[in-house]
Regions:
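Long, low-complexity intrinsically disordered regions
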Residues: 65, 153-156
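His/Asp/Glu-enriched, well-ordered alpha-helical/loop segment
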Residues: 10-109
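Helical hairpin unit composed of two closely spaced alpha helices linked by a short loop
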Residues: 3-6
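Generic hydrophobic, helix-prone segments enriched in Leu/Val/Ile
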Residues: 36, 47, 120-125, 156
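Thr-Gly-centered strand-to-loop micro-motif
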Residues: 1, 24-27, 139
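C-terminal cap of metal-dependent C-N hydrolases
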Residues: 92-151
């Protein structure tokens, strides 16, 4: 389906209903940004544009669905869904710690008193960037962030 002036929006819901594995990724050589947060934002925008163009017949994706495509969906497409892409027993621990307060805040919209976890997560995805990522873990090892150079069981 073409949205607007020739922009293509994939029929993701149709793919998923048919059992086609769908992952969300980024290729800075073929896009505007290498940021997965930006890829998630663009996926939300494109899916909602598709909903408008289809007059509501093809519902836009939710933030939770887009997050799933960016994590477990990508792992499943690569045949790695049993090892990575979500938290679980015997899975590799890949994670980020997001800073939402003070100097760690980056450009993220201010977290307000009373914001639940869902609201904070949405603010991070929609307005955050790498400056909000205060720690990054890959395969259980701290690869970026506070404590990386300290002698700890996690980061060393």
């Amino acid at each position: 389906m073409t949205v607007g002036g020739g922009f293509m929006a994939a029929p993701v819901r149709q793919f998923l209903r048919r059992g086609i594995k769908v992952g969300l990724g980024t290729d800075s050589g073929g896009g505007y940004s290498s940021s997965m947060l930006d890829a998630m934002r663009q996926a939300l925008i494109a899916s909602h544009a598709r909903e408008v163009m289809s007059k509501g017949a093809d519902k836009g994706l939710s933030l939770a669905e887009v997050f799933g495509l960016a994590t477990l969906g990508g792992a499943q497409v690569c045949g790695l869904g049993e090892r990575i892409g979500s938290f679980g027993v015997a899975k590799e621990f890949d994670a980020i710690v997001v800073g939402t307060q003070g100097d760690e805040q980056g450009i993220m919209t201010m977290v307000e008193e009373g914001d639940g976890l869902g609201a904070v997560f949405e603010k991070f995805v929609m307005t955050g960037d790498d400056r909000n990522m205060v720690e990054v873990y890959v395969r259980g090892r701290l690869v970026k962030g506070r404590g990386k150079d300290q002698e700890t069981g996690v980061g060393s």
